[in-house]
């Protein structure tokens, strides 16, 4: 700045001199005339002035021109001051200059006489040269000042105070950061002092020559030198790394001065710490970039590998001393070999680092050594540093040199030097000398692990010691990110991933909330590396140990919960991060981990992805505030009642549609258009654009007026109604009077409008022409008076248009905004009226002429409004349809079989919505896509399950333009339709309409298809009760169109539960959701029917062959009828089946007197079913209509979804489908064995994934076996064997079934590379496989009755396991003869024998499965892995480990449950005055653990895995525990007394019926928690009488079966 000031002064002086020169030139001409007169007077003055001028002129070259000019000015002023007292200062200045130049010229004039030429000539040259220099300097200064002003322009800022405050804050932050760097740099002294103190203490105390390592206290100094100074890094490698980073950053940027400073510091690394007043990030080598961090990590890896490859190490092992020894050895090797240092090529190639010796060998400069000597006395004897190769072990002579150059020698030397300072005595020196004689320690894995654990712990402590000294949050975040990057590079082989997660957890607690997004961004960048290292640790280091896998996963879950809390606390909440963290869990954790199965699945975390949707709405729509009307609030409150929503919508459309369309919707629609098209423009730009559009529209309307006038005249002539016209003429006269009054008001407006509107000036020319025409009209008034009668007739034709006119005029007067479009028309009309005021007699004629003009204008206006109203009506109706669609998607359970007609309403609403979407213009969509704000906002609605946000008009207008949202919405509708189709059985696979639609082009194959349908109906695997109303085949894959991947239609359940006309059973899962009391009645009906069916099934096999023959004869007769009349009406089929069913039941009742009551109930139900079938005749038309609607609905949806090119929605499809399936499994309170998993295949658009099909129903319940065998059957039937007899067909079927069963597990092989969604799908498969494998284990091994009574075991297996043989016997009695039945029974016996022979295989599987499930339940109980983590000490053997594993479940968990009981007792005792908040009952963790412990002790492990949870009510569980312990004790007492003596006399049928009754009573107790004890006491009396006939093993006495408890209770 000083230089600038000096240059500015010089510039001023130069400018003054130039001005003086110009003035002097003008004066010269005047002075030449008076030369002779001035000679004598001024000769004396010339010599004096010359001397002064020469002196001043010489000084100007060295000094500033300002001072010289001032001196001359002062001297001249002083001399002339006495002469000219009264004159001004400026005149004196001019005169002095004139005198000076006059003297010069007089002197030159006299040169000829005196001979003083050379001196004056030289003086003139100097003057000219000075002028040239002045000009150059002036130009240079001018350029410099222009550059300065261009670079440092001052901004016109109104709020200077705010800028000053922000500048002050920035300065404070910079000062804080600088102080933090100073603290970090000055921390070296602290680490060195601690190292000296600890080393002296340890060396003097531990004198014993044992093989134990002393704790190393030199890590802090070592880490400081490495991480902050970079002492041990190679110079060339570091320079090359910094160059790479600068190349990446400065590809397009120019090098600035700061960057030059950085390059200089990178060249002189050793001199960084000597810089003063530059405590920046360049002092810390961690912040040099990722390449320098990679060098640091490579050095640490090399050092740890070298320690591992050593043979021996001293007991007093210090890393600093070890590094110094390595460097001394490398120096000697360098002298011998004299190798040149290699150039660092790639820091990421770790293989080359092991091969090249000097790649990691670090040679320091002499400057570094001097610095270390001055700073650290430890490095007084140190020289240049190098590293050692890991691959080459040390030879024997070098080991001897190592033992001679032990670290103790160095320590003794240092102690002798610092004896006076530290106060060391001779005794201490003797002790340290004795330590030299200690034995060396051989390195083992155990010792190396200790060194490595100490390394990790010291590294962690070093990190946090540095972080404690930091106060600025930015710098703290930067340290955390860099340190976590270093730990990530060192994992999993050098830093254990458990320790890494612990470090990350500590970082997560420390990091500030505002900067949490940067920390998560680090994981987003390094996601793949983190997952790879996690899996490498899992497979290579742990070797897939289930206990350790669960514990590590639990810690990772804890870390992610910490981050999620920080995200929720942040004001600028971004739910994308929480969604990312949950997906990272789903990819890291294995499929079998409990945290992945339970809560951290992607299924339950999609709402985190769009949690800030409301915030976005409030931010983006500041002008249009989101305010919910009463209509919207009513919809939100009544969203579950579809009928109420329908009535509200109808009421709104009928009553408030006009108000809404005219007032609210027009404003909102215009605002939405403008916001979408011009988002960034202000209010002014929007107003201007509206005006431009209005003027364009007015120009177009004038051209169309003539055409519309002609059309109106024609319509007027056609609509001549004389009676009505006379009445309307009277009304027109009244209206004309009103119009005259309005003209007066309009005249005033015209005067104002002429001043305002600039565009009317252009139209004055047109108005003048019209005025000329008006003058002609005045002359023709007399002629027109005679023709008034003709005009009145014409007016009557236009009365229909006048009615529209009056309505529009009222709107024009009230709404000035609408008049802006038509101001030009009104002004023209006003001019007509102003000229005709005087002629009152001729007013009628003028009015009639004016009416024609106005009607033409108004008709155009009404047409425009009609178009706008059309748009608003469509938008409004589409909004109403959108609400109904959203309600339909959110709660599909509303629609039942009684309310199927509501599907038509949904379809109509879909049509209106789709038509509105297709009618939107492409330009608006493109403009909308360009706006990033709205796109970011709309992403919030893709997976959002909440409706409250969607029920708003403003948001609806935005969502309509987004294709992603529409894709999601239409796919959700498709899923709901298929869901309802599965449940309500609307569209079945082979209806006549579908066959016709699919086989239009295949007329030749119709007969073959009919035959195949008949054959398939003969070979159905369902019971006789499962016959359809429509007579269709049931087991073919659902294929209707080539897009069959989306159309998963109904395949009737192959279970024994559904009956023909039982509406309660069809819709019990839907009605069960309504009320809990209604659930009980449903369960009673279900279980009565199950008990009756089980009795029928048991009697069917034990009876004689007479019943079977009767059944076969009756069914053969029926099947002959069905073969002939396959495509007939449904009523005949129903009647025939029902009558035959009656006869069969009567035959069974004659043989079995025990089951009379049950069979009577069934007959009573079947008579009701027949009546219900007759009632179905009235509803048959409705069903056909709904079928057509469903097919068209699904086709339109699929056509829309196929229009999208992007395949990103495949992930979304899997999520949505799985959500509805799991929703049904978990929410439906239904104790049946129905197969709810639908065989659903996804369409793969990507070419790489064409062959993949995600099947959910590969391994569900046993019903899938029937599905798969049925597909087998159909494949065989479609071959050339269709001409064979029915008997041969049956034989092939049975052979296929028996051979097919063992091949089922082959389909469950999982691929290696699975997506997170595919892992979610596989969870269900894994747990269902466990259930399947455990059923035969219990049936064959647990019950003693089975081993004794083999004949009765068959029936038990057939009922419990639902074997295929029973289904075949009951369903295919149409064709089976006695001989064939014998063959079937032989196959059944073989199957049962095979299951009994395969007990060893089941036992082997169970041993593994048992361990698998135990590990899952362990993590349920305590995620910290308190009891089940094994000790790491070497003393434990494998046998002890196995024993401890067994004790975990049996002893420790039960003891833990007893402790929980005691805590509840303490809470409930009135003596102990404990507040409710402090009670352990209210702790959610306590509730969770108690429920899981309860399940482990009292309920079987393997029945809970899939979808059966328990309550967390502590008091309820406590009462159940007490009652169950009493029951167990009573059972033991009964068994010990030997009450049960005759095991063979037990009836299996009675046994089953009693168990079903128990289940009914216990399942009724789900909602009655208060009366649990009373109901269980009543249960005891019944169980004591019933359980006398039961014998079980002692293990089952401890663990009760799940039938004794209500299982389907959901967690609160």
Swiss-Prot record:
Membrane topology qualifier: Single-pass membrane protein
Biotechnology: Possible candidate for an effective malaria vaccine as determined by epitope response in sera.
Compartment(s): Membrane
Listed Acidic residues bias regions: 1567-1597
Region feature Disordered, mapped onto this chain: 46-94, 369-400, 698-777, 992-1037, 1091-1157, 1257-1291, 1554-1612
Annotated GO CC locations: membrane
TM regions (residue ranges): 479-499
Biased composition (Polar residues): 375-394
Biased composition, class Basic and acidic residues, residue ranges: 46-93, 708-777, 1554-1566
UniProt keyword Coiled coil, yes or no: yes
Keyword field contains Transmembrane: yes
Naturally occurring in which organism (per UniProt): Plasmodium falciparum (isolate 3D7)
UniProt protein name: Uncharacterized protein PFD1115c
Biased composition (Low complexity): 996-1028, 1102-1140, 1257-1271
Coiled coil: 23-52, 1338-1362, 1444-1469, 1553-1601
Keyword line: Coiled coil, Membrane, Merozoite, Transmembrane, Transmembrane helix
């Amino acid at each position: 700045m000083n230089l600038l000031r000096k240059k500015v002064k010089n510039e001023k002086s130069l400018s003054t001199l130039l001005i003086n020169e110009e003035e002097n030139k003008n004066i010269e001409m005047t002075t030449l005339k008076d030369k002779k007169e001035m000679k004598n007077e001024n000769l004396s003055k010339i010599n004096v002035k010359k001397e002064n001028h020469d002196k001043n002129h010489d000084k100007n070259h060295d000094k500033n021109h300002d001072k010289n000019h001032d001196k001359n000015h002062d001297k001249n002023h002083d001399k002339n001051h006495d002469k000219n007292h009264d004159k001004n200062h400026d005149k004196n200045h001019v005169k002095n200059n004139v005198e000076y130049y006059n003297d010069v010229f007089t002197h030159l004039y006299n040169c000829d006489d005196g001979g003083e030429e050379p001196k004056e000539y030289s003086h003139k040259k100097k003057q000219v040269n000075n002028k040239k220099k002045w000009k150059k300097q002036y130009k240079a200064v001018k350029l410099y000042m222009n550059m300065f002003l261009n670079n440092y322009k001052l901004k016109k800022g109104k709020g200077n105070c705010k800028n000053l405050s922000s500048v002050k804050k920035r300065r404070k932050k910079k000062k804080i950061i600088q102080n933090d760097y100073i603290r970090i740099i000055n921390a070296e002294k602290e680490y060195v002092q601690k190292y000296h103190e600890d080393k002296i203490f340890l060396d003097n105390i531990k004198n014993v020559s044992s093989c134990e390592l002393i704790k190393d206290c030199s890590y802090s100094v070592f880490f400081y030198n490495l991480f902050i100074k970079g002492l041990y890094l190679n110079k060339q490698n570091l320079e090359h790394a910094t160059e790479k980073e600068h190349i990446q950053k400065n590809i397009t940027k120019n090098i600035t001065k700061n960057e030059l400073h950085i390059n200089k510091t990178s060249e002189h690394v050793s001199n960084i710490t000597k810089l003063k007043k530059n405590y920046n990030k360049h002092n810390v080598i961690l912040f040099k970039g990722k390449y320098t961090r990679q060098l640091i990590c490579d050095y640490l890896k090399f050092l740890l590998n070298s320690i591992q490859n050593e043979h021996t190490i001293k007991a007093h092992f210090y890393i600093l001393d070890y590094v110094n020894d390595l460097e001394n050895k490398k120096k000697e090797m360098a002298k011998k070999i004299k190798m040149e240092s290699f150039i660092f090529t790639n820091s990421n190639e770790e293989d080359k680092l092991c091969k090249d010796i000097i790649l990691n060998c670090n040679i320091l400069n002499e400057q570094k050594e001097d610095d270390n000597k001055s700073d650290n006395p430890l490095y007084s004897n140190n020289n240049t540093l190098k590293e050692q190769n890991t691959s080459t072990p040390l030879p024997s002579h070098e080991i001897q040199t190592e033992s001679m150059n032990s670290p103790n020698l160095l320590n003794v030397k240092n102690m002798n030097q610092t004896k006076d300072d530290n106060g060391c005595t001779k005794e201490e020196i003797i002790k340290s000398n004795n330590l030299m004689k200690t034995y060396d320690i051989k390195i083992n894995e155990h010792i190396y692990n200790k060194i490595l654990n100490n390394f990790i712990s010291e590294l962690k402590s070093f990190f946090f010691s540095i972080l404690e000294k930091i106060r600025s949050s930015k710098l703290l975040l930067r340290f955390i990110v860099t340190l976590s990057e270093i730990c990530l590079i060192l994992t999993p082989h050098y830093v254990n991933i458990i320790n890494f997660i612990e470090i990350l957890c500590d970082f997560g607690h420390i990091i500030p909330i505002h900067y949490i997004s940067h920390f998560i961004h680090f994981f987003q960048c390094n996601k793949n590396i983190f997952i790879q290292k996690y899996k490498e640790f899992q497979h290579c280091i742990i070797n897939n140990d289930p206990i350790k896998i669960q514990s590590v996963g639990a810690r990772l879950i804890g870390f992610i919960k910490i981050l999620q809390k920080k995200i929720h606390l942040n004001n600028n909440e971004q739910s994308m991060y929480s969604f990312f963290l949950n997906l990272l869990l789903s990819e890291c954790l294995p499929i079998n981990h409990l945290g992945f199965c339970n809560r951290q699945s992607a299924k339950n975390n999609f709402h985190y992805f769009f949690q800030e949707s409301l915030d976005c709405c409030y931010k983006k729509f500041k002008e249009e505030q989101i305010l919910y009307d009463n209509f919207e609030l009513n919809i939100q409150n009544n969203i579950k009642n579809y009928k109420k929503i329908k009535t509200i919508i109808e009421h709104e459309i009928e009553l408030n549609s006009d108000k809404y369309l005219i007032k609210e919707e027009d404003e909102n629609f215009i605002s939405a258009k403008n916001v979408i098209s011009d988002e960034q423009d202000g209010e002014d730009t929007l107003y201007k654009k509206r005006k431009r559009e209005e003027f364009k529209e007015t120009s177009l309307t004038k051209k169309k007026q003539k055409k519309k006038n002609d059309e109106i005249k024609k319509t007027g002539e056609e609509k001549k109604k004389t009676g009505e016209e006379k009445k309307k003429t009277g009304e027109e006269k009244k209206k004309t009077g009103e119009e005259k009054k309005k003209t007066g008001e309009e005249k005033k407006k015209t005067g104002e409008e002429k001043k305002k509107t600039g565009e009317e000036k252009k139209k004055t020319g047109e108005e003048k022409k019209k005025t000329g025409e008006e003058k002609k009209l005045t002359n023709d008034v007399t002629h027109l008076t005679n023709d008034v009668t003709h005009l009145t007739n014409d007016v009557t034709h236009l009365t229909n248009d006048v009615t529209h006119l009056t309505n529009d005029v009222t709107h024009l007067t009230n709404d000035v905004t609408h008049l802006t479009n038509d101001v030009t028309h009104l002004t023209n009309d006003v001019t007509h009226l102003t000229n005709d005021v005087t002629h009152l007699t001729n007013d009628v004629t003028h009015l009639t002429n004016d009416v024609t003009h106005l009607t033409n204008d108004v008709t155009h206006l009404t047409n425009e409004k009609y178009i706008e109203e059309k748009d608003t009506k469509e938008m409004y109706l589409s909004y109403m349809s959108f609400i109904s669609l959203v309600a339909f998607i959110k709660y599909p359970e509303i629609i039942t079989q009684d309310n199927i007609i509501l599907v038509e309403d949904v379809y109509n609403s879909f049509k209106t919505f789709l038509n509105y979407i297709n009618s939107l213009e492409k330009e608006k969509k493109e403009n909308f896509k360009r706006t990033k704000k709205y796109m970011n906002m709309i992403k919030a609605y893709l997976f959002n399950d909440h409706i409250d946000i969607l029920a708003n008009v403003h948001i609806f207008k935005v969502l309509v333009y987004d294709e992603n949202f529409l894709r999601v919405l239409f796919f959700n509708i498709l899923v709901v339709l298929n869901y309802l189709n599965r449940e309500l059985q609307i569209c079945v696979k082979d209806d006549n309409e579908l066959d016709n639609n699919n086989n239009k082009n295949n007329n030749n194959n119709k007969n073959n298809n009919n035959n195949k349908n008949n054959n398939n109906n003969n070979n159905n695997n369902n019971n006789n009760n499962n016959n359809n109303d429509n007579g269709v085949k049931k087991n073919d894959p659902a294929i209707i169109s080539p897009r069959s991947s989306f159309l998963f239609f109904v395949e009737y359940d192959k279970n024994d539960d559904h009956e023909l006309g039982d509406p309660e059973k069809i819709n019990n899962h839907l009605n069960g959701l309504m009320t809990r009391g209604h659930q009980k009645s449903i369960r009673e009906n279900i279980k009565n029917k199950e008990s009756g069916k089980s009795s029928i099934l048991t009697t069917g096999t034990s009876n004689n062959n007479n019943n079977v023959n009767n059944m076969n004869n009756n069914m053969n007769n029926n099947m002959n009828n069905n073969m002939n009349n396959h495509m007939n009406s449904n009523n005949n089929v129903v009647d025939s089946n029902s009558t035959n069913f009656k006869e069969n039941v009567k035959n069974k009742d004659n043989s079995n007197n025990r089951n009379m009551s049950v069979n009577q109930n069934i007959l009573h139900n079947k008579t009701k079913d027949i009546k219900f079938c007759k009632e179905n005749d009235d509803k048959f038309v409705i069903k056909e209509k709904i079928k057509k609607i469903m097919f068209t609905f699904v086709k339109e949806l699929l056509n829309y979804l196929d229009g999208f090119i992007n395949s990103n929605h495949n992930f979304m499809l899997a999520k949505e489908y799985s959500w509805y399936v799991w929703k049904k499994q978990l929410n439906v309170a239904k104790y049946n064995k129905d197969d709810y998993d639908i065989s659903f295949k996804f369409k793969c658009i990507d070419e790489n994934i064409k062959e993949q099909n995600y099947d959910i129903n590969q391994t569900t319940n046993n019903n899938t076996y029937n599905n798969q065998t049925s597909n087998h059957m159909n494949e065989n039937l479609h071959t050339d064997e269709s001409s064979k007899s029915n008997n041969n067909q049956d034989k092939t079927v049975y052979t296929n079934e028996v051979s097919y069963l063992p091949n089922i597990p082959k389909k469950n092989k999982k691929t290696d590379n699975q997506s997170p969604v595919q892992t979610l799908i596989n969870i269900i498969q894994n747990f269902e496989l466990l259930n399947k494998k455990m059923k035969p284990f219990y049936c064959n091994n647990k019950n003693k009755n089975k081993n004794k009574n083999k004949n009765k075991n068959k029936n038990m297996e057939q009922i419990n396991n639902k074997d295929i043989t029973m289904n075949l016997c009951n369903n295919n009695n149409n064709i089976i003869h006695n001989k064939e039945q014998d063959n079937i029974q032989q196959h059944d016996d073989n199957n049962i024998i095979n299951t009994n022979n395969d007990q060893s295989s089941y036992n082997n599987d169970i041993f593994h499965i048992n361990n698998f499930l135990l590990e899952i339940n362990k993590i349920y109980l305590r995620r910290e892995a308190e009891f089940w983590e094994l000790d790491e000490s070497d003393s434990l053997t494998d046998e002890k480990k196995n024993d401890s594993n067994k004790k975990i479940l049996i002893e420790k968990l039960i003891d833990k449950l007893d402790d929980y009981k005691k805590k509840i007792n303490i809470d409930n005792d009135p003596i102990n005055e404990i507040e409710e908040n402090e009670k352990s009952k209210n702790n959610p963790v306590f509730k969770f653990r108690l429920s899981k412990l309860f399940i482990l002790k009292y309920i079987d492990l393997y029945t809970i895995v899939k979808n059966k949870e328990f309550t967390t009510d502590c008091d309820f569980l406590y009462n159940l525990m007490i009652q169950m312990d009493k029951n167990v004790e009573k059972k033991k007492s009964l068994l010990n007394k030997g009450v049960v003596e005759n095991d063979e006399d037990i009836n299996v049928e009675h046994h089953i019926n009693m168990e079903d009754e128990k289940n009914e009573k216990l399942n009724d107790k789900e909602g009655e928690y208060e009366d649990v004890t009373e109901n269980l006491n009543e249960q005891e009396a019944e169980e004591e009488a019933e359980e006398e006939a039961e014998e079980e093993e002692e293990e089952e006495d401890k663990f009760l079966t799940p039938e004794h408890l209500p299982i389907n209770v959901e967690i609160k």
